[in-house]
Regions:
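Short, charged recognition helix plus adjacent turn
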Residues: 3, 96-100
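Amphipathic alpha-helical interface surfaces
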Residues: 21, 37, 41-45, 54, ...
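Residue-level detection of the helix-turn-helix DNA-binding "recognition helix"
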Residues: 74-75
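DNA major-groove recognition helix of helix-turn-helix/homeodomain DNA-binding modules
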Residues: 81-97
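Key DNA-contacting residues within the recognition helix of helix-turn-helix
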Residues: 70-71, 85
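Short alpha-helical DNA-recognition segment
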Residues: 47-70
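N-terminal flexible/basic segments that precede or flank functional cores
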Residues: 1-44
């Protein structure tokens, strides 16, 4: 019998590609602004972190405790913008702004 991947597993696999991860983060950030819900972007960053080594590896690169990093990216967490940017950088990506 053929095994199928779940949505999350498939997403994490796709997010290992930096181009895909960049497009995903851009789309989620745009959606966050449109809906005034920054939680969307925060969870997108969490997905990218999971795809690029997980909480332990990325928090180590950021030189922060895994526990506080995990809490800040949880659904109930309120991550600072600087935390999100540092996590993105630790995943080998960067945040850019362009004229509208």
């Amino acid at each position: 019998m053929r095994k199928y991947k779940g949505y999350k597993e498939h997403l994490i696999e796709k997010l290992r590609d930096s181009e895909y991860a960049s497009a995903y983060l851009n789309a989620c950030l745009e959606n966050s602004f449109e809906t005034k819900n920054m939680g969307i972007f925060q969870l997108a960053v969490r997905d990218v972190v999971e795809a690029h080594g997980g909480m332990t590896e990325i928090s180590s690169k950021m030189e922060v405790s895994r526990e506080s990093f995990y809490r800040s990216l949880s659904q109930k967490g309120k991550a600072r913008f600087s935390t999100l940017v540092n996590a993105i950088k630790a995943c080998g990506l960067e945040l850019e702004f362009h004229p509208a």
